[in-house]
Amino acid sequence: MIKQAVILAGGLGSRLKDKTKTMPKGFLEIGGTAIVEQSVQKLLAHGIEKIVIGTGHCNEYYDNLAKKYPAIITVKNENYANTGSMGTLEVCASFVNESFLLLESDLIYDSAGLFSLINDERKNLILASGATKSGDEVYLEADEKNCLTGLSKNRDALKNIFGELVGITKLTKSTLDKMCAYAKIHHSDLPKMEYEHALLEAAKTIPVAIKRIEYFVWREIDNEDHLEMAVKNIYPHIVENEKLRAVRREVLLNPGPATTTDSVKYAQVSADICPREKAFGDLMQWLCDELKLFALASETNPDEYETVMFGCSGTGADEVMVSSCVPDTGRLLVIDNGSYGARMAKIADIYKIPMDIFKSSTYEPLDLQKLEAEFATKKYTHLACVYHETTTGLLNPLHIICPMAKKYGMVTIVDAVSAYCGMPMDLKSLGIDFMASTSNKNIQGMAGVGFVICNKAELEKTKDYPMRNYYLNLYDQYAYFAKTHQTRFTPPVQTMYALRQAVLETKQETVQKRYERYTACWNILVAAIKKLGLKMLVKEEHQSHFITAILEPETPKYSFEALHDFAAEHSFTIYPGKLGNIDTFRIANIGDIQPEEMRRFTVKLKEYMNGIGVGV
């Protein structure tokens, strides 16, 4: 797995004349986006966690780009005017601690090249193409094993031409170190050394393979002719190629699984791996560390919390908590104000856990005074509740409920399946001890991984609790992973890779910005509902902004099935209500849904409703 990249962007770009006098050539725009930003987006879509950009000329452009993409680290080559690309790579080297991709900043290319390098088992690998006739080629010479033996802009200086250097290379950290050591020796006599020169020297002692893709679509933009060729011929070809690999877009307006990006879908396509390998254990540990951060404020110490993962659904994670976190001597109070609270009560009942149910309206806010009176009886050691009731979109005020429960000495167990990563939260200030969620809701991954984020002190107390469940036992799973770096049973490997990509994309967007995007979509939906004269089940001030339960129109012409099928014809999936005594349908705006897509849906909703005489 390649997780780091370096982009060399220190050059003056003088051959592009006035176009790069006041900006770096990486900021030439093609298709409305700077070419270096296109490269950054492609790297992120291929699972790159850290992008080190070596800057020089007009470095502030890259510093501003880093504000948009948290994965970017910029490092300025202060002597950029007097050094070659190797000088810029040298200043980046200390920020690289493992194998990485090395790219030039002035490239446009088909993203298939990244996949090809990342997926290849060879550790040091140069991407090459067939003949481009660009007029500024760097030719590569190879031996019988397709390993680099020479490179030059003068093809007559080489014995054979294996391909042309693209400017994207996969290297190990040790190879980078050899390149830097060689460059250091020659600072005085070769001050303007290019990275290719140092790589060729390293190739004398380390195999550096060449991967030639004969018809690879790319262009390095060094002069105005290159730019014209890129705009007219190369870029349209790249766009066409990448569109061919795009997955058909279906906008899921159901409450989960949610719509995912193509990059999350494609993250599942990886080389087979035994989940007992250390590399996969490292991946799971990284996920555990990252997942809890989305539920904690920056000032909260993450060492006080642990993430425990299972191959299961969100309901599975709920069952983990309920069955594992209440001792035989305890008593559980379950708040039931929707199907998911009722589900937690059902789980407790099946395990015969001593329990009472606090029943409340499915669409009106909880009576907090009545709830506190129940807490004050001091009958209960544990509280189980749902943060966001997916049945209706009702958001329970956990910032009041859980601290109130803690006041009465209760351990709090929370289903945050439909709240986590959709809104900022801090388990510590909320007073949540155990929180369940899943990979397929607001974190925007694929279905298959359930997890519990635990207050570590409370988790340790469960060590001696009765083991009511084998597969879903919380402490056993936690202790086994801590000891072996493995789960007790086979994890959903490909789903874990997709979850990793979803985590990276959540870090890029941030939970706060995701909440704002979800809210923008919700505002569009609510405005359309009101304009049509439809009614929402839950008052706006008590809604989550994630899911909206809409009362079905009172006309015999209405049919949910007909509305569902009409929406499906236009690539939208909607979901029926789950309240037995109230007829509703639900529209969710979670996942990778954009405001423009919600606008398109509301147009279709209006079209259907007007067709049956509603909102006319």
Swiss-Prot record:
Signal peptide start-end: none
Keyword Heme: no
Species whose genome carries this gene: Treponema denticola (strain ATCC 35405 / DSM 14222 / CIP 103919 / JCM 8153 / KCTC 15104)
Gene3D superfamilies associated with the record: Aspartate Aminotransferase, domain 1 (3.90.1150.10), Spore Coat Polysaccharide Biosynthesis Protein SpsA, Chain A (3.90.550.10), Type I PLP-dependent aspartate aminotransferase-like (Major domain) (3.40.640.10)
Control of this protein's activity: Cytidylyltransferase activity is inhibited in the presence of EDTA and is restored by the addition of Mg(2+) or Zn(2+).
EC assignment: 2.7.7.107, 2.6.1.37
Gene: pntC
Cofactor note: Shows weaker cytidylyltransferase activity with Ca(2+).
Pathway: Phosphorus metabolism; phosphonate biosynthesis
The protein's name: Bifunctional 2-aminoethylphosphonate cytidylyltransferase/aminotransferase
